[in-house]
Amino acid sequence: MVEKNKEYIFDIISQGYEGEGIAKIDNKYPIFIEGALKGEKVKVRIVKVNKNFAYGKLMEVLEASEERVNPPCAIYKRCGGCKLQHASYKAQLDFKWDRVKDCVSKIGKLDPSIVKYPLGMENPWRYRNKVQLPIGLINGEVKIGFFAPRSHDIIDMESCLIQDEIGDKVVKLTREWIEKFNIRPYNVDGEYDEKGIVRHIMIRRGFTTNEVMVVLVTNGEKLPHKEEFVDLMVKNIPGIKSVIQNINSKKTNVILGLESKTLWGEDTISDYIGDFRFNISPLSFFQVNPIQTEVLYGKALEYANLTGNEEVFDAYCGTGTITLFLSQKAKKVYGVEIIPQAIDNAWINAKENKVENVEFFVGESEVVIPDLINKGVKADVVVVDPPRKGCDKKLLDAITNIDAKKIVYVSCDPSTLGRDLKVLEENGYKTLEVQPVDMFPNTAHIENVALLIKK
């Protein structure tokens, strides 16, 4: 065992699911050390001790991995945004590959050789088309940035290397406006001030269209000097198309409220994924890395291997982005989603893109899909793109009961993917391949697409 606040020297033998280094005592008791890489010898101070594991703080790298690099971000060690900037991009992809293989083999009980090497980015920086940052007044100074890990302390940010560069400029201008007109933030020294006005700033940009939306989230309708804010954005932000005030007066960690007022320009901006154009409002869901989204959806379409004669189900279809991709090669695609507003947007997206061979349904996929089967729809291919918690067990049961010929599983969590693949394998399906896609470079997150066929 180890003792809290004492320092030890460890060899890092592996990495955890969040990218942290792992050392072991007697090959049993794990120590988790953020910032350490596999193969390194490190000096560590123990900060937390539990019965089955401990956490350590990296004090010094005694023998560095060849894959260690100097993080280019000035606030990397304090910010909670990225976890892997200290690793080369190759090492990041290797880690994510190992993680997916580990989940597929240990949780899914499958041969890890079915997991292909991750599809990475040519440039793993500046890939996010959306940034949302809290605004605070800390010790009398205006802070706009990210929360520190496991806290509400705002780490002031001048530039974020994974966000679009236009966001840096908007943040600078917003800070200048707050300071010039003495606009009081809602977050004051880590506490919520009911008299505070500004809560967050959000920037969205269409990478293909170059259209920019700036959203200022306020604690109520009151917004003094809003004309000056609008003027500052319109005169200084290239591609600006929309300046919006979003009102969120609730005591909550949820960033956006339900009411938005357009202060200048349009209510939405637009962007493309492949050949499809999508309208984006402040509250719209839209993948934050459009470059890799096209790669992800392209792989899903490749796995579906449609000839134009198939009827396809798209479960958890959201606003219909994957549905539209599938429509290019399918006879008909049926999208199912439990959130009514998402289905409203899906119909709008289909209409905007003149796609007619799709139909959308509000409801639980495990109820809607069997009902459509009973009405004569064929289950040639089922595509699922569930949230992080994975597929509902009832949906997996429904898929196996309707005897779908092929399943394409799009996943944002390797652990729940492994769990669900195991269930499907036990119920008549065979997993042919899993393809990781790196949607979030410099973080520990990894997306996957899996192909299953009926045995």
Swiss-Prot record:
What are the EC numbers?
Answer: 2.1.1.-
Pfam families assigned to the protein according to its UniProt record, in alphabetical order: TRAM, tRNA_U5-meth_tr
Gene Ontology MF terms in the entry: 4 iron, 4 sulfur cluster binding; metal ion binding; rRNA (uridine-C5-)-methyltransferase activity
The catalytic residues are 412 (nucleophile)
Question: Where, by residue number, does the polypeptide cross the bilayer?
Answer: none
**Top-level EC class as recorded in UniProt:** transferase
Chain sites annotated for binding [4Fe-4S] cluster: 73, 79, 82, 160
A Gene Ontology biological process noted in the UniProt record is: rRNA base methylation
Q: Where does S-adenosyl-L-methionine bind?
A: 287, 316, 337, 385
Q: What keywords sit in the KW lines?
A: 4Fe-4S, Iron, Iron-sulfur, Metal-binding, Methyltransferase, S-adenosyl-L-methionine, Transferase
Database matches in SUPFAM superfamilies? Nucleic acid-binding proteins (SSF50249), S-adenosyl-L-methionine-dependent methyltransferases (SSF53335)
TRAM domain residues are 1-60
- Family that this chain belongs to: Belongs to the class I-like SAM-binding methyltransferase superfamily. RNA M5U methyltransferase family.
Name by which UniProt lists this protein: Uncharacterized RNA methyltransferase CPE0367
Please tell me the species this chain comes from: Clostridium perfringens (strain 13 / Type A)
